[in-house]
Amino acid sequence: MSMLPSFGFTQEQVACVCEVLQQGGNLERLGRFLWSLPACDHLHKNESVLKAKAVVAFHRGNFRELYKILESHQFSPHNHPKLQQLWLKAHYIEAEKLRGRPLGAVGKYRVRRKFPLPRTIWDGEETSYCFKEKSRGVLREWYTHNPYPSPREKRELAEATGLTTTQVSNWFKNRRQRDRAAEAKERENSENNNTGANKQNQLSPLDGGKSLMSSSEDEFSPPQSPDQNSVLLLQGNMSHPGASAYSMTGLGAAQSVHGMQGHPHQLQDSLLGPLTSSLVDLGS
């Protein structure tokens, strides 16, 4: 462990200071500390120093410098989650400034597709919303048995998946909300289908039959009254001599008309027979 030239700290001590200042949130102080480091390539290539530089660049909004650091050095897997968050958040912020509005889930998805994680901070495994598929599989399996894990169980799941407890809690919360929304939609569709079926059942087939029968009955004279054609024939023959004889004959024929409505030929004979006889009498 040798001291750095013209500097009172060893490389390990510098790395420790960077980690402590990051964890304490003293990012401005961390930035001043990094600026005070001597120009030593070996020191500036230390992974803790590089990670500290990336954090400070993000904090100051210097995203171009952040991307350069993340793309130019191979980082250890245990640092990937933190650096991936910096990469994605920086691109989200730039996209929001460009569009002038916050990004939704779809907007963030498009940003991730447009700016994929560099292999220097990504092991190549497919991710979804920054969750590895293996981690999501563990959460899905747990959800099928218990959608409401306890705080202790959430901590255990976080350790098993490499996620934070907050990420685990948010995953279960979002999954429950999606399932409730799907169930509500299914109930709504079922109720709408039942309502439509009930309305159809309320329209009795007898109603339609009744209206058809009513219209049919209106086209015919009631059985107690003479047929309109017969009445007209009777009225026309009353003005001729011998009308009284015909009127009786016509009336008798009219009374039998309704019994023959189902037989058109019989109806025609019953009306024309008396009329022909009357015309013969009038002509003689």
Curated annotation (Swiss-Prot):
Pfam families: Homeobox_KN, SIX1_SD. One of its GO terms (biological process) is regulation of skeletal muscle cell proliferation. Transmembrane segments: none annotated. Residues 167-238 are annotated as: Disordered. Keywords: Activator, Apoptosis, Cytoplasm, Developmental protein, DNA-binding, Homeobox, Nucleus, Repressor, Transcription, Transcription regulation. GO terms for cellular component: cytoplasm; nucleus; transcription regulator complex. Residues 124-183 bind DNA. The keyword Transcription regulation applies. The keyword Ribosomal protein does not apply. SUPFAM superfamilies: Homeodomain-like. Changing Y129C: Impairs transcription factor activity. Coiled coil: none annotated. GO terms for molecular function: DNA-binding transcription factor activity, RNA polymerase II-specific; RNA polymerase II cis-regulatory region sequence-specific DNA binding. It comes from the Eukaryota. It is found in: Nucleus; Cytoplasm. Disruption phenotype: Morpholino knockdown of the protein increases both cell proliferation and apoptosis in the otocyst. Increases proliferation of neuronal cells and decreases the number of cells destined to form hair cells. Disrupts myogenesis by interfering with the proliferation of dermomyotomal cells expressing pax7 and loss of myog expression. Signal peptide: none annotated. Residues 179-190 have a biased composition (Basic and acidic residues). Belongs to the SIX/Sine oculis homeobox family. PANTHER family: HOMEOBOX PROTEIN SIX, HOMEOBOX PROTEIN SIX1. Transcription factor that is involved in the regulation of cell proliferation, apoptosis and embryonic development. Depending on context, functions as a transcriptional repressor or activator. Transcriptional activation is enhanced by eya1 (in vitro). Plays an important role in the development of the inner ear, where it promotes hair cell proliferation and inhibits proliferation of neural progenitor cells. Required for normal myogenesis. Plays a role in the development of fast muscle fibers throughout the body, as well as the development of craniofacial muscles. This is Homeobox protein six1b. It comes from Danio rerio (Zebrafish).
